[in-house]
Swiss-Prot record:
<feature type="modified residue" description="N6-acetyllysine">
    <location>
        <position position="329"/>
    </location>
</feature>
<keyword id="KW-0547">Nucleotide-binding</keyword>
<keyword id="KW-0966">Cell projection</keyword>
<comment type="function">
    <text>Component of the chaperonin-containing T-complex (TRiC), a molecular chaperone complex that assists the folding of actin, tubulin and other proteins upon ATP hydrolysis. The TRiC complex mediates the folding of WRAP53/TCAB1, thereby regulating telomere maintenance. As part of the TRiC complex may play a role in the assembly of BBSome, a complex involved in ciliogenesis regulating transports vesicles to the cilia.</text>
</comment>
<feature type="binding site">
    <location>
        <position position="107"/>
    </location>
    <ligand>
        <name>Mg(2+)</name>
    </ligand>
</feature>
<protein>
    <recommendedName>
        <fullName>T-complex protein 1 subunit delta</fullName>
        <ecNumber>3.6.1.-</ecNumber>
    </recommendedName>
</protein>
<dbReference type="GO" id="GO:0005832">
    <property type="term" value="C:chaperonin-containing T-complex"/>
</dbReference>
<keyword id="KW-0479">Metal-binding</keyword>
<dbReference type="GO" id="GO:0005929">
    <property type="term" value="C:cilium"/>
</dbReference>
<dbReference type="InterPro" id="IPR002194">
    <property type="entry name" value="Chaperonin_TCP-1_CS"/>
</dbReference>
<dbReference type="InterPro" id="IPR027409">
    <property type="entry name" value="GroEL-like_apical_dom_sf"/>
</dbReference>
<feature type="compositionally biased region" description="Low complexity">
    <location>
        <begin position="1"/>
        <end position="16"/>
    </location>
</feature>
<feature type="binding site">
    <location>
        <position position="56"/>
    </location>
    <ligand>
        <name>ADP</name>
    </ligand>
</feature>
<dbReference type="InterPro" id="IPR027413">
    <property type="entry name" value="GROEL-like_equatorial_sf"/>
</dbReference>
<dbReference type="InterPro" id="IPR012717">
    <property type="entry name" value="Chap_CCT_delta"/>
</dbReference>
<dbReference type="GO" id="GO:0005813">
    <property type="term" value="C:centrosome"/>
</dbReference>
<comment type="similarity">
    <text>Belongs to the TCP-1 chaperonin family.</text>
</comment>
Length: 542
């Protein structure tokens, strides 16, 4: 008998069939679903463990190098996972989980994966004790519903007019980032940016596309600024005109150059007279285009980038210069919507449609020099009602600028969360410890397996304070025990003060986060864990 064929020990196939549903013979491979489940759980836990060290203000950063050799330095959970090449399908679910949290709340992308990892760890212990996955799944759903109630009880309502609270929320988000030392500059900038694009009285959400982040290499993060208006990184094409007051701005999508034939034709010019006629015709054609533009009163012209041919010929530039029209070319197609919303202009595809009512207006359009590190074009004092702002991010190198942009995006998302759901909750691991405590009490009111599973869910919540303490160099066991004790005495807002390296009332330290971040993290993590639990087989298809 060959070695790789295991000897059959059970009854022959016919006997198994005859036995019908009796005994274990109806379904031989009972271990496979359990093995698949444990394989999925361990793969997903490996992802959670990979980013555990980057949680909190004292968390470490990751350096990620992609296949092309580009390097990213970050401690944003969503960015780390997005760039990791995860192959296991269950582990990929955690990457998607982090992405979902980034879309929903924008912050808490690391926490949500760590909570999911901890819940999966609890599942392993429950499964090993022989509890059925469906019972675990239903109990976790019950625990989640109770958990959201507990978090909502802990939260306090906030008004958008309370600027101090908004600043504290943005600062808490920025404190765990690489750019944390600049949070005193970036927090007010993020709050002002969001407040300028919404009406605080009626807003229920924020469209972050109204806040454009422009990256410009050079300077330091201290040079970042918020501009009410439009900032373009392109250069002014005609160097003579760099400042225009009372600007009338046109945006064209056609080319200011000699027309090309639709088909590939050749024209043979045999003598100088014909050559002269061709040049004269070209000159007259371009001059006519420029005159039509000037006739509308336009004095700043933005030209969309053309990939087919030169969008702006030297001759056209010469005429525009003579007519004192400032020209900015190579405007990207994706920027056009934002430009139109900001300055109230309309894009024009043909010169015949270029009329005065297509123009936008602004108080000032000028090219600004950035202390030797290039130039920017600023268009300010826009008359149009479009509520948009631009944040200019500066930095000494590409890595710093990109991380600063991600950090500002997270801070903007935190303010957006407060606009969506106007309630705040303490940070520093306080809500998680309170959850663990109250869910444990709740589990005592239940009986049977359900009580046991909810108790395991409660214990899993302690991973956040434990990780925060570990990353801050504190003893996780004594810190979590002390926290439990203080919360049992009714101190709901006691959490880990990472800056001072101890335990204190977190609200007094102004460490706060939107309720939506915590609720979203708990909901999404539980849903993902329940999905992974229900999987008992992985089938590969071609």
């Amino acid at each position: 008998m060959p070695e790789n064929v295991a000897p059959r020990t059970g009854p022959p196939a016919g006997a198994a069939g005859a036995a019908g549903g009796r005994g274990k013979s109806a379904y031989q491979d009972r271990d496979k679903p359990a093995q698949i489940r444990f394989s999925n759980i361990s793969a997903a836990k490996a992802v959670a463990d990979a980013i555990r060290t980057s949680l909190g203000p004292k968390g470490m950063d990751k350096m990620i190098q992609d296949g092309k050799g580009d390097v990213t330095i970050t401690n944003d959970g969503a960015t780390i996972l997005k760039q990791m090449q995860v192959l296991h399908p269950a582990a990929r679910m955690l990457v998607e989980l982090s992405k979902a949290q980034d879309i929903e709340a924008g912050d808490g992308t690391t926490s949500v994966v760590i909570i999911a990892g901890s819940l999966l760890d609890s599942c392993t212990k429950l499964l090993q004790k022989g509890i059925h996955p469906t019972i675990i799944s239903e109990s976790f759903q019950k625990a989640l519903e109770k958990g959201i109630e507990i978090l909502t009880d802990m939260s306090r309502p906030e008004e958008l007019s309370d600027r101090e609270t908004l600043l504290n929320s943005a600062a808490t988000s920025l404190n765990s980032k690489v750019v944390s030392q600049y949070s005193s500059l970036l927090s007010p900038m993020s709050v002002d940016a969001v407040m300028k694009v919404i009406d605080p009285a009626t807003a229920t959400s924020v469209d972050l596309r109204d806040i454009k982040i422009v990256k410009k290499l050079g300077g330091t993060i201290d040079d970042c600024e918020l501009v009410e208006g439009l900032v373009l990184t392109q250069k002014v094409a005609n160097s003579g005109i760099t400042r225009v007051e009372k600007a009338k701005i046109g945006l064209i999508q056609f080319c200011l150059s000699a027309p090309k034939t639709d088909m590939d034709n050749q024209i043979v010019v045999s003598d100088y007279v014909q050559m002269d006629r061709v040049l004269r015709e070209e000159r007259a054609y371009i001059l006519n285009l420029v005159k039509q533009i000037k006739k509308t009163g336009c004095n700043v012209l933005l030209i969309q980038k053309s990939i087919l041919r030169d969008a702006l010929s030297d001759l056209a530039l010469h005429f525009l210069n003579k007519m004192k029209i400032m020209v900015v070319k190579d405007i990207e197609r994706e920027d056009i919507e934002f430009i139109c919303k900001t300055i109230g202009t309309k894009p024009v595809a043909h010169v015949d449609q270029f009329t005065a009512d297509m123009l936008g207006s602004a108080e000032l359009a000028e090219e600004v020099s950035l202390n030797g590190s290039g130039k920017l074009i600023k268009i300010t004092g826009c008359a149009s009602p479009g509520k948009t702002v631009t944040i200019v991010v500066r930095g000494s190198n590409k890595l710093v600028i990109e991380e600063a942009e991600r950090s500002i995006h997270d801070a903007l998302c935190v303010i957006r969360c407060l606009v969506k759901k106007r309630a705040l909750i303490a940070g520093g691991g306080a809500p998680e410890i309170e959850l663990a405590l109250r869910l444990t009490e709740y589990s005592r009111t239940l009986s049977g397996m359900e009580s046991y599973c909810i108790r395991a869910f409660a214990d899993a919540m302690e991973v956040i304070p434990s990780t925060l303490a570990e990353n801050a160099g504190l003893n996780p066991i004594s810190t979590v025990t002390e926290l439990r004790n203080r919360h049992a005495q009714g101190e709901k807002t006691t959490g880990i003060n990472v800056r001072k390296g101890g335990i204190s009332n977190i609200l007094e330290e102004q460490v706060v986060q939107p309720l939506l971040v915590s609720v979203s993290a708990l909901t999404l993590a539980t849903e993902t864990v329940r999905s992974i639990l229900k999987i008992d087989d992985v089938v590969n298809t071609r």
